Amino acid sequence: MAPSTLTALAQEKTLNSKFVRDEDERPKIAYNKFSDEIPVISLAGIDDDSVDKRSQICRKIVEACEDWGIFQVVDHGIDIDLISEMTRLARQFFALPAEEKLRFDMTGGKKGGFIVSSHLQGEAVQDWREIVTYFSYPIQARDYSRWPDKPEGWRSITEMYSDELMALACKLLEVLSEAMGLEKEGLTKACVDMDQKVIVNYYPKCPQPNLTLGLKRHTDPGTITLLLQDQVGGLQATRDGGKTWITVQPVEGAFVVNLGDHGHYLSNGRFKNADHQAVVNSNSSRMSIATFQNPAPNATVYPLKIREGEKAVMEEPITFAEMYKRKMSRDIEMATLKKLAKEKVLQDQEVEKAKLQMTPKSADEIFA
């Protein structure tokens, strides 16, 4: 049976138990307590003939990738009208009646469409979000029957948007290729036939946002991700294993750029894979549009260049399909172990409770 949407659950006073996370996974800072630690980099002049201007921009990008694996770009050349239209139509889709959205339900392994929430196999707790997924590259593999046909015009706008974002991603990969001492197309070529999917995230208002996450902590498996977010706030990043978190300051018209595991491995660990999550709030719904650029399944994953004195961060070359499979297996195993540990604690508590109830009473208690 197709799931209901989060709209009804968002109206309740308490959070449904399937979204309640363990204390160690709950938000540590507020969705709107913004930090300016993530650099905002202007790309104005990156294509100019001025070597100095380009080198300055490239240096800032490289430093951000070495420091956080995440940064924001402005003056990126993407038409502001296209961005506005993509955002407007996405909001209209999520405002549709549940039955309209669920016509594109992608549960059961369907390639693209709408889905309510998300969680790993073996994990009980779900993320507080609704999603539309477009598999947009390779172009010849697009299945337009899985692309929502409402609101009118969204399909064609998404096509234009995905093309523009692919071009921007490749431009940023050129910068990182040069920084690694490779030819401009080094990282792009390593992806073979680059894959892309566009995921539109909708995070409804939440009755108890301190108990859940819109999207649990993770790193992206692919090469590079470009995220367009609204001004509400909720994207958070960490670089110390989750001990401390910052909320990324939303910047109007900017794209948040973060590197994934594939980009991390190709750079031999020089560039960080951004460790991030999304939190929700009880005041405003939030929307973001993430565009993931990934290598082809058969692309080789291994450092493209190993600097003198360094060791490879991988034992052997593997395909991206195998890398992704191992990542998912590890995540599922960790989720399963955590679930079993939680169940064991509850069982132990029940046993202790039963023992206390069976403890013989003293004579004073019996004759009281």
Swiss-Prot record:
<dbReference type="GO" id="GO:0046872">
    <property type="term" value="F:metal ion binding"/>
</dbReference>
<protein>
    <recommendedName>
        <fullName>Flavanone 3-dioxygenase</fullName>
        <ecNumber>1.14.11.9</ecNumber>
    </recommendedName>
</protein>
<keyword id="KW-0847">Vitamin C</keyword>
<keyword id="KW-0284">Flavonoid biosynthesis</keyword>
<dbReference type="InterPro" id="IPR027443">
    <property type="entry name" value="IPNS-like_sf"/>
</dbReference>
<dbReference type="Pfam" id="PF03171">
    <property type="entry name" value="2OG-FeII_Oxy"/>
</dbReference>
<dbReference type="InterPro" id="IPR026992">
    <property type="entry name" value="DIOX_N"/>
</dbReference>
<dbReference type="InterPro" id="IPR050295">
    <property type="entry name" value="Plant_2OG-oxidoreductases"/>
</dbReference>
<feature type="binding site">
    <location>
        <position position="220"/>
    </location>
    <ligand>
        <name>Fe cation</name>
    </ligand>
</feature>
<comment type="function">
    <text>Involved in the conversion of (2S)-naringenin to (+)-(2R/3R)-dihydrokaempferol.</text>
</comment>
<keyword id="KW-0560">Oxidoreductase</keyword>
<dbReference type="GO" id="GO:0009813">
    <property type="term" value="P:flavonoid biosynthetic process"/>
</dbReference>
<dbReference type="InterPro" id="IPR005123">
    <property type="entry name" value="Oxoglu/Fe-dep_dioxygenase_dom"/>
</dbReference>
<feature type="domain" description="Fe2OG dioxygenase">
    <location>
        <begin position="191"/>
        <end position="295"/>
    </location>
</feature>
<keyword id="KW-0223">Dioxygenase</keyword>
<dbReference type="InterPro" id="IPR044861">
    <property type="entry name" value="IPNS-like_FE2OG_OXY"/>
</dbReference>
<comment type="similarity">
    <text>Belongs to the iron/ascorbate-dependent oxidoreductase family.</text>
</comment>
<dbReference type="Pfam" id="PF14226">
    <property type="entry name" value="DIOX_N"/>
</dbReference>
<feature type="binding site">
    <location>
        <position position="276"/>
    </location>
    <ligand>
        <name>Fe cation</name>
    </ligand>
</feature>
<comment type="pathway">
    <text>Secondary metabolite biosynthesis; flavonoid biosynthesis.</text>
</comment>
<keyword id="KW-0479">Metal-binding</keyword>
<feature type="binding site">
    <location>
        <position position="286"/>
    </location>
    <ligand>
        <name>2-oxoglutarate</name>
    </ligand>
</feature>
<dbReference type="GO" id="GO:0031418">
    <property type="term" value="F:L-ascorbic acid binding"/>
</dbReference>
<keyword id="KW-0408">Iron</keyword>
<feature type="binding site">
    <location>
        <position position="218"/>
    </location>
    <ligand>
        <name>Fe cation</name>
    </ligand>
</feature>
<dbReference type="GO" id="GO:0045486">
    <property type="term" value="F:flavanone 3-dioxygenase activity"/>
</dbReference>
